[in-house]
Amino acid sequence: MIQQESRMRVADNTGAKELLCIRVLGGTKRRYASVGDTIIATVKQANPGGSAKKGEVVRAVIVRVKKGYTRPDGSMIQFDDNAAVIINQQGNPRGTRIFGPVARELREKQYMKIISLAPEVL
């Protein structure tokens, strides 16, 4: 579960290494974000020469959460870290590669480009 001030890794090759959540999108009372939700975040650490710069405000979609959650079929899934992928205004990823596994829930949220770039979908 991601909320304001949560820090997470970046799972793409935009050059950003760490994000800090500023806002969870989806209404004024929305407090938590899980897999497939969109957030507004700022880049806290970045590699030099990358397209994402430190201090830049970006949109990102959550691809992994450390908190375990139950799927409708009864299975439970939990990842080792919190991670997000930086997206543009149209919802397409800014990077050209995605690192690490992503959750199957992204397919239901219509993030097909992220699903196709990911090395593993759990």
Swiss-Prot record:
GO terms for biological process: translation. The keyword Nuclease does not apply. GO terms for molecular function: large ribosomal subunit rRNA binding; structural constituent of ribosome. The keyword rRNA-binding applies. InterPro entries: Ribosomal_uL14, Ribosomal_uL14_bac-type, Ribosomal_uL14_CS, Ribosomal_uL14_sf. CDD domains: Ribosomal_uL14. Keywords: Ribonucleoprotein, Ribosomal protein, RNA-binding, rRNA-binding. It comes from the Bacteria. GO terms for cellular component: cytosolic large ribosomal subunit. SUPFAM superfamilies: Ribosomal protein L14. NCBIfam families: rplN_bact (TIGR01067). Binds to 23S rRNA. Forms part of two intersubunit bridges in the 70S ribosome. Belongs to the universal ribosomal protein uL14 family. Part of the 50S ribosomal subunit. Forms a cluster with proteins L3 and L19. In the 70S ribosome, L14 and L19 interact and together make contacts with the 16S rRNA in bridges B5 and B8. This is Large ribosomal subunit protein uL14. It comes from Herpetosiphon aurantiacus (strain ATCC 23779 / DSM 785 / 114-95). The gene is rplN.
